[in-house]
């Protein structure tokens, strides 16, 4: 993908990355819901899929295989000199962010978690400035704030209070803060690889997923989840087909994500991945004629305003040439 992307004109590269991420993860989301929320079996013996670690493990394996194929056919000339510890650190921070974000839902409500995750570009930018001494134009800061505010407003849906919701105050917010910090560290690691080692997108994708596979593999063996999953798959073999498709859409989506990181940096990647969910919901609203509240219209305007201003005035971050 990295090699083939050189055939794409510069002006089309960013739209290609955005569309690639959007289309792949749109179908990825459908498959994810089908796998994790579907009912298996009949009558009183119906079961649900509860093997989250195994699902992510298979996803990482498919990603790694896909990246290896891309390197073999399109990227053989590139020599990867990136330090292994950087890949390991990146995979640890990525997995940690994902686990922290999901665990936070035990202590905070969904809107709070969404608001936290929508702020992902902020730690990427802050850590990039503080640790890497990277400079962004003021317009970039304003555009990121507009986009984050727009996505948060669009996705926020106040619930009607039916009873008293109690949860431990502070712990959930701490987990979200940890998740955001780890997201930022992942972005800093990727930025460091780009700046000092000119790491290719395919090599980045391969090695981060290999390390993630190693960590998750140890996890599912230690917990015994792997054997429970194999027993489940034996009872419902169609799950294997859906999981493989799920892994393939993830691999394609990740190849576009890593290509975005290499050519445009982790901040732009964060903007794309943050707004992806917004556009997915927007497409759902258009296709199924779901109503949009005034607050969501404000969010829509802010996101498109932020994206438009960023395209026109937000340039200025130094890019690695390939």
Curated annotation (Swiss-Prot):
This is Solute carrier family 35 member B1. PANTHER family: SOLUTE CARRIER FAMILY 35 MEMBER B (PTHR10778), SOLUTE CARRIER FAMILY 35 MEMBER B1 (PTHR10778:SF10). GO terms for biological process: UDP-galactose transmembrane transport. It is found in: Endoplasmic reticulum membrane. Belongs to the nucleotide-sugar transporter family. SLC35B subfamily. The di-lysine motif confers endoplasmic reticulum localization for type I membrane proteins. It is a multi-pass membrane protein. GO terms for cellular component: endoplasmic reticulum membrane; Golgi membrane. InterPro entries: SCL35B1-4/HUT1. It catalyses: ADP(in) + ATP(out) = ADP(out) + ATP(in); UDP(out) + ATP(in) = UDP(in) + ATP(out); UTP(out) + ATP(in) = UTP(in) + ATP(out); dATP(out) + ATP(in) = dATP(in) + ATP(out). It comes from the Eukaryota. Keywords: Antiport, Endoplasmic reticulum, Membrane, Transmembrane, Transmembrane helix, Transport. Its main location: endoplasmic reticulum. A motif (Di-lysine motif) lies at residues 318-322. It comes from Bos taurus (Bovine). ATP:ADP antiporter that catalyzes the exchange of ATP and ADP across the endoplasmic reticulum (ER) membrane. Imports ATP from the cytosol to the ER lumen and exports ADP in the opposite direction. Regulates ER energy metabolism and protein biogenesis. Appears to be part of a calcium-dependent ER to cytosol low energy response axis, where calcium efflux from ER to the cytosol triggers ATP import into the ER lumen to maintain sufficient ATP supply. Provides ATP to ER chaperone HSPA5 that drives protein folding and trafficking in the ER. The chain crosses the membrane at residues 12-32, 51-71, 85-105, 136-156, 168-188, 210-230, 243-263, 285-305. The keyword Transport applies. GO terms for molecular function: antiporter activity; UDP-galactose transmembrane transporter activity; UDP-glucose transmembrane transporter activity.
């Amino acid at each position: 993908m990295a090699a083939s992307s050189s055939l794409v004109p510069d002006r089309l590269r960013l739209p290609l990355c955005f569309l690639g991420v959007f289309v792949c993860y749109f179908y990825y989301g459908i498959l994810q819901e089908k796998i994790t929320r579907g009912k298996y079996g009949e009558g009183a013996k119906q079961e649900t899929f509860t093997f989250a670690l195994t699902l992510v493990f298979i996803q990482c394996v498919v990603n790694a295989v896909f990246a290896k194929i891309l390197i073999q056919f399109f990227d053989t000339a590139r020599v990867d000199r990136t330090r292994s510890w950087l890949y390991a650190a990146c995979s640890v921070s990525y997995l940690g962010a994902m686990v922290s974000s999901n665990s936070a839902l035990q202590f905070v409500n969904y809107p709070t978690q969404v608001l936290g995750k929508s702020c992902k570009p902020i730690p990427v930018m802050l850590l990039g400035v503080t640790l890497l001494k990277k400079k962004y134009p003021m317009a970039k800061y304003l555009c990121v704030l507009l986009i984050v505010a727009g996505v948060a407003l669009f996705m926020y849906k106040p619930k009607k209070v039916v009873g008293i919701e109690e949860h431990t105050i502070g712990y959930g917010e701490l987990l979200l803060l940890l998740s955001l910090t780890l997201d930022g560290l992942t972005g800093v690691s990727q930025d460091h690889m780009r700046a000092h080692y000119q790491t290719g997108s395919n090599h980045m994708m391969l090695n981060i997923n290999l390390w993630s596979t190693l960590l998750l593999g140890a996890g599912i063996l230690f917990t015994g989840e792997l054997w429970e999953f194999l027993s489940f798959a034996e009872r419902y073999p169609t799950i294997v087909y859906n999981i493989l498709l799920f892994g393939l859409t993830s691999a394609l989506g990740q190849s576009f994500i890593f290509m975005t990181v290499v050519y445009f940096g982790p901040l732009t990647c964060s903007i794309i991945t943050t707004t992806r969910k917004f556009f997915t919901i927007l497409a759902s609203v258009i296709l199924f004629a779901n109503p949009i509240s005034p607050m969501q219209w404000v969010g829509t305007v802010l996101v498109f305003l932020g994206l438009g201003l960023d395209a026109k005035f937000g340039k200025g971050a130094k890019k690695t040439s390939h």
